[in-house]
Amino acid sequence: MSDIYEIGEALIGDGPELAHIDLIVGSKQGPVGTAFATNMASMSVGHTPLLSVIRPNLPTKPATLIVPKVTVQNLDDASKIFGPAQTAVGRAVADAVEEEIIPKDIVEDIVLMVNVFIDPSAKDYRKIYQYNYGATKLAIKRAFDKYPSVDKVLAEKDRGTHPIMGFKAMKLWNPPYLQVALDLDNEDRMRSIIRDLPKRERILIEAGTPLVKKFGVEIISKIREERPGAFIIADLKTLDVGRVEVKMAADETADAVAISGLGTNESIEKAIHECSKQGIYSILDMMNVSDIPSKLEELKLKPNIVLLHRNIDSETMRDNDGEQQSEWGNIKDIKSKLGKRGLIAVAGGVTPEKVDTALANGANIIIAGRYIIGSSDVRRAAEDFLRYLPQDSDTMRLALDEDEKI
């Protein structure tokens, strides 16, 4: 077992007594064994490691070192670590051996290092014990099960919300979406509309060009005040100095920036690169671009999203192969230029009755402006679109049921 090196993590409980365990399991002869000895010999003020014991004079097997994550500042803090937390970890390790989570024949060959989180405001020793016992045993099981798998991580990375973070950072992983274009010049009206919009993950909020021109990119932060977890697009229609404008929008917490497809390839690529660097989406607005597929082929860096506008001559439009095009061109052909993760947004006189057609032709994002922001009943107008879209992705999901195999 000289090559064993596994990592486990678990969070259990609620309130100040919440338990968060990080642990490493490894051979005494390997790097974990070295770290174990080093930590015992090199104590840190406020983070003194201690051997896990089930009771005085009875250390658990395999040998386990507990390291407090939060600085121990007084004897009250120390009592929580040396009392309920230490007992919880020791018993969890012993029970993991008894239940054959840890093979009994390797307990003398391996060691565990367990990082324990104890909130200084925690009071209930029973909860400290129970939560840390459960979290430690679960973390051990996860370590030996190699949980989570890479596939699990990729499936969950854009879905979860960290309980301490308090809000969900949206990613466009499960289209379709409705993008509400706030093409306004009045901040009070903007706030009123946002408050009236349904609180749905399917809704994206666009800081329209008039808003940005009148109030600057700071208007993005004002939108964020009204809806902290929203996905916000800054419609800058960037033509030049894209890097500067993208960074300005990103600094105000924009999730995406719209770049004009009329810019030079160099300017567009610089803006797309800056979006990638800032960790936000790039949207290439193809308004008045005559040959969209060719434009995309010319770009070395592709945008995350291409925005297509309705062509008024669409009823007579066909592509080079004679295939009838949608109002927004041959969406499937355009999407093929972006790669499998590329998205298509459509705009231009979109009404609820056109949603099914747009989605059937391959659109991922439906952009609506006047129909919603010009309505006396903003919520109803938005719901006119939303009834054509699926439920929010996790409406019927019981996330905890999907975490562990039985």
Curated annotation (Swiss-Prot):
Catalytic activity: 5,6,7,8-tetrahydromethanopterin + formaldehyde = 5,10-methylenetetrahydromethanopterin + H2O; D-ribulose 5-phosphate + formaldehyde = D-arabino-hex-3-ulose 6-phosphate
UniProt cross-references to SMART domains, sorted A to Z: OMPdecase (SM00934)
Region (3-hexulose-6-phosphate synthase): 165-406
HAMAP family per the UniProt record, alphabetical: Fae_Hps
Active-site residues, as the UniProt record annotates them: 20
Keyword Iron recorded: no
Chain's role: Catalyzes the condensation of formaldehyde with tetrahydromethanopterin (H(4)MPT) to 5,10-methylenetetrahydromethanopterin.
Known pathway: Carbohydrate biosynthesis; D-ribose 5-phosphate biosynthesis
The species this protein was found in: Methanosphaera stadtmanae (strain ATCC 43021 / DSM 3091 / JCM 11832 / MCB-3)
E.C. no: 4.2.1.147, 4.1.2.43
Chain sites annotated for binding substrate: 22, 51, 69, 71, 86
GO molecular function: 3-dehydro-L-gulonate-6-phosphate decarboxylase activity; carbon-nitrogen lyase activity; hexulose-6-phosphate synthase activity; hydro-lyase activity; orotidine-5'-phosphate decarboxylase activity
Organism lineage string: Archaea, Methanobacteriati, Methanobacteriota, Methanomada group, Methanobacteria
Residue segments, region Formaldehyde-activating enzyme: 1-164
GO biological-process terms attached to the record: 'de novo' pyrimidine nucleobase biosynthetic process; carbohydrate biosynthetic process; L-ascorbic acid catabolic process
Protein name per the record: Bifunctional enzyme Fae/Hps
Similarity annotation: In the N-terminal section; belongs to the formaldehyde-activating enzyme family.
Database matches in InterPro entries: Aldolase_TIM, Fae/Hps, HCHO-activating_enzyme, HCHO-activating_enzyme_sf, HPS/KGPDC, OMPdeCOase_dom, Ribosomal_Su5_D2-typ_SF, RibuloseP-bd_barrel
Pfam family for this entry, one: OMPdecase
